[in-house]
């Protein structure tokens, strides 16, 4: 079973409120895969906990997803103030010899907004009423 089919079978959906099926979002070819690890919601630390405690799994999954989408550039975008998370992910990238890179975002709200993230990471601007895919990016 392909990775895309596994994602579909698992019923994975986005957490942005609309519940958009992840397999549909990732069924594309892009230049950039950006993993949104900015975690802008006040008092939430789930992503941060995962980055510290499951860093190798995150890096491996990002690399696999990047390969699946044909991404030439794979980034985990997180806030520059996340020192422990940056250290854990950096070690995981080295240990796994992964093509994944970290992008350190400024610590502001809403750093995790898709349009802001695309612009910060790639320098590209998503057109009005557009989506990141319009400029060769997918955010996960």
Give the positions of each predicted feature.
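Short, hydrophobic/aliphatic alpha-helical segments
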Residues: 1-11
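Conserved phosphate/anionic-ligand binding catalytic regions in large, soluble enzymes, centered on
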Residues: 9-27
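Short helix/loop capping segments that flank catalytic or ligand/cofactor-binding pockets
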Residues: 23, 43-45, 113
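Structural signature of FAD isoalloxazine-binding scaffolds in flavoprotein oxidoreductases
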Residues: 27-36
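Gly-rich Lys/Arg/Thr-decorated short loops/hinges at beta-loop-alpha junctions or inter-strand turns
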Residues: 35-47
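Histidine-anchored nucleotide/phosphate-binding helix
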Residues: 52-68
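Short, surface-exposed connector motifs at secondary-structure boundaries
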Residues: 67-75
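Hydrophobic alpha-helical positions that pack around
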Residues: 75, 81-140
């Amino acid at each position: 079973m392909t990775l895309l089919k596994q994602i579909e079978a698992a019923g994975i959906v986005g957490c942005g409120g609309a519940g958009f099926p992840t397999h549909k979002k990732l069924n594309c070819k892009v230049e950039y895969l950006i993993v949104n690890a900015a975690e802008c919601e006040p008092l939430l630390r789930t992503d941060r906990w995962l980055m510290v405690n499951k860093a190798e799994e995150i890096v491996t999954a990002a690399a696999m997803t990047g390969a699946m989408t044909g991404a030439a550039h794979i980034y985990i975008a997180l806030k520059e103030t996340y020192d422990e998370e940056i250290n854990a992910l950096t070690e995981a990238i080295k240990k796994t010899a992964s093509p994944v890179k970290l992008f350190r975002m400024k610590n502001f709200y809403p750093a995790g907004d898709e349009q802001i993230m695309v612009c910060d990471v790639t320098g590209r601007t998503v057109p009005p009423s557009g989506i990141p895919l319009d400029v060769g990016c997918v955010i996960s």
